[in-house]
Amino acid sequence: NERYQMAGLAKNVEADTVLVGTSMAANYRSSWIQETFGTSAVRLTIPDGYYSEFDQVMNVLFRTQEPERVIFGLDVNTLIRDESGVTAAMPDYLYNANPLDDIQYLLNKDTLYYSAYTLLSNHWGEGDTIDEGFTWDRNEWWNHISALENYDRPEIAAEELPADAYRDDVAANLAVAERWVTEHPDTEFDFFLPPYSILFWDKVIREGRTEAVFAAIRQAGQTLLQYDNV
């Protein structure tokens, strides 16, 4: 479970370049980042993550180390939504500064079982490496037919959403990212837009959200690019 294990990776894997994002970034291997930037690297992903959850990951990361570069996947879906959908899935006790309450995780019977299983699997050469951990592309076969089979095409909306429909939610999310940038001026932050499927954009167009989504992307660029370390 990424929400449990990202805390440990952020605390214990020293890296000069850190990739943070949703499952859209999960298949970018750390080894690729190492090769590209010539530095040590680690990937920290929270599937369908909210900015409050990414904030917890960042707090742990910067509490234990000061990476040279953070690469953050600026997903459109997560950028434009508010925090109303956040669940209790994030184990707050693993992300706070108190090591004593981590005991409930360390002595959990499932944790002990899977830890022993992982250690034995790695010993036998059958376990996942950190490079492959939490990737999901190895057992999937993608083509246009399977993509269309899983796509429920919406009806065309009667009206377009106003361009500023997401403005306030985007501003609230960007305020979180701005705090990372301003509190860590010696770290370079590279924000990128993960490549969404053409079916995503078809859905956006048919739902009348095109201008609102583009406005959100422009808002992100205008907000973040004003900083020297972005």
Q: Which residues are covered by each model-predicted region?
A:
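Start-of-domain marker
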Residues: 1-14
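N-terminal post-signal-peptidase region of extra-cytosolic proteins
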Residues: 2-5, 50-57, 174
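Hydrophobic/aromatic residues located in beta-strands of well-ordered beta-sheets
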Residues: 70, 189-191, 230
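Second-shell loop/turn segments in exported
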Residues: 43-48, 162-167, 203-208
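Active-site segments of SGNH/GDSL-like serine hydrolases
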Residues: 181-207
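Secreted/periplasmic serine-hydrolase-like ester/acetyl group-modifying domain
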Residues: 74, 83, 87-188
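Membrane-embedded segments
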Residues: 14-106
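Substrate-gating cap/lid alpha-helix
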Residues: 200-230
